[in-house]
Amino acid sequence: MTVIYPSPIFGPVHSRRLGVSLGINLLPEDGKVCTFDCIYCECGFNSDHRPKKPLPTREEVRAALEARLQDMQKNGPVPDVLTFAGKGEPTAHPHFPEIIEDTLALRDKYFPKAKVSVLSNSTFIHRPAVFEALNKVDNNILKLDTADEAYIRELDRPAGHYSVREIIGGMKAFKGNCIIQTMFLKGGFGDKDMDNTSDKYVLPWLEAVKEISPRQVMIYTIDRETPDHDLQKATHEELDRIAALVREVGMAVSVSY
């Protein structure tokens, strides 16, 4: 069963990585809009969830967010974070930069201690307006599942033009103002072995992470049902080993098992 995210506001939910998180979904609630089609995505495969409804407008997002924040200010709970996530890639919304401006202003008005986080697959960070918007949020969380482009094409299945070297270059441009998020898993997809926990994938990934020099690395594994049922969680030991390698090069790392 795939996860359903209402639009434009959902939750709050308890996030393994972020705490009490109020979700902001800039995609239609009846489908999925993403430049990736990850085989582990809790929202299912893109082809199974084509939306019929339009994207929420900037005005709809702002009004819904303010109403929810007013309710939370009165009735609780206090959010730790306002998180752009949901059913697809938030930076694909044509008014993403303006929505970030609105969100930061509303955060400052109602819950100034809350963080604003964006979970992004990094495919639009080459756009100047998107880059500038991501540079303003508290937690600019960018996906990099490996540094191996052939593997990314099997795991994340990006649409259109995709170059992992260009993505890494775009991440470097944040000059440390980013968090790298990486999914580690095992199992197969069709006849392909999708295990990325071995040194074959981990060591080149670690070199890329060193090159990007983020302020933090988040490593995690499958938590919910995936559209491909042959995938498996990475073990605690495997994640701990990878985390130790990250710490050895002097970077902060968090692990979600």
Report each predicted region and the residues it spans.
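Glycine-rich beta-strand-to-loop/alpha-helix junction loops that act as flexible
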Residues: 83-89, 121
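Conserved AdoMet/S-adenosylmethionine-binding subsite of the radical SAM
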Residues: 92-232
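Conserved alpha-helical substructure of the radical SAM core
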Residues: 45-81, 95-98
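Auxiliary Fe-S-binding modules of radical SAM enzymes
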Residues: 2-17, 63, 70, 186-257
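Short hydrophobic-acidic sequence motifs that mark active-site Asp/Glu residues
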Residues: 21-23, 81, 141, 179
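Short strand->helix junction
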Residues: 31, 89-90
